[in-house]
Amino acid sequence: MTDITGRVALITGAARGQGRSHALTLAAAGADIVATDISKPITTVPYELATPDDLAGTVAEVEKLGRSVIGLECDVRDGAALDGAVEAAISHFGKIDILVANAGIWALGPLWELTDDQWQDMIDVNLTGVWRSIKAVVPAMIANRGGSIVLTSSVNGFEAGAGFGHYVAAKHGVLGLMRNAALELGRYNIRCNAVCPGFVDTKMNDWQGAYDMMAGGPGGTREDRQSGAHNWSVLAGRGALSPATISKAVLWLASDDAADVTGVALPVDGGHLILPGINADPVHDL
């Protein structure tokens, strides 16, 4: 089993979903955890975001694993708040070895109908928030003579997605940011990679808009979501992926097992990106 005993990991978006899974997986492998999350609504996000109780739940689950943990309410759109989280981590643990920049949102809307706020919130959280997270931790990692940064992109960092172009733009940007961070930080023994999940079973895609997308129109159900998830994978029996599957990749990238791996975008998608491309909704006549 991969061992990261003695490491300190700061994880954004850690209150639930993939972020909580990452926190528990890294803690089970020996890391102490700094768990952060916004824990309040964003008006342009159409589903309920994590709550302070969710964040407290992550903290409690990490403690059950016998690891030290602090939970901090922190909005990745706020650079000062991220700096404060890093300061709290250094004060409590003395260092930060690992950053998992996981915080993210998803929403739907044709590109030409998005409001300025919808566009800006998506970019501010999913791209600028990742940059702010890197910016906040790098000085501490340089002082510590190394570190590992794992960013959450998506299969939509490689491909387009009809109806959520602002998300696609942000996730493409994360991969460019990752590569440049790897290039600039290598001289300080800091690695930077990205994990690119496929369709993962979390609250982010468990709402009516996601059901309708999977059903191909209004009136979709959760069953349509579950059934449609099978279309995202080439592997037998795979529907929506478990967050734990993504966490295993995050742990590997964060660990010394990947000591010579940097600048890599790692899909964890059940083979989604090798699926033959088709037009699922062709227009036959003008």
Listing of model-derived features with the role each one plays in the protein:
Residues 3-40:
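Canonical Rossmann dinucleotide-binding motif of NAD(H)/NADP(H)-dependent dehydrogenases/reductases
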Residues 139, 183-184, 259:
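Alpha-helical segment proximal to the catalytic Tyr-Lys
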Residues 159, 250-251, 262-286:
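Short C-terminal tail/terminal secondary-structure segment
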Residues 154:
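Residue(s) in the substrate-gating loop at a strand-loop-helix junction
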Residues 194, 216-261, 266-270:
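C-terminal helical subdomain
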Residues 134, 170, 178:
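Active-site helix of classical SDR
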Residues 62, 110-111, 118-123:
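Substrate-binding pocket helix/loop in short-chain dehydrogenase/reductase
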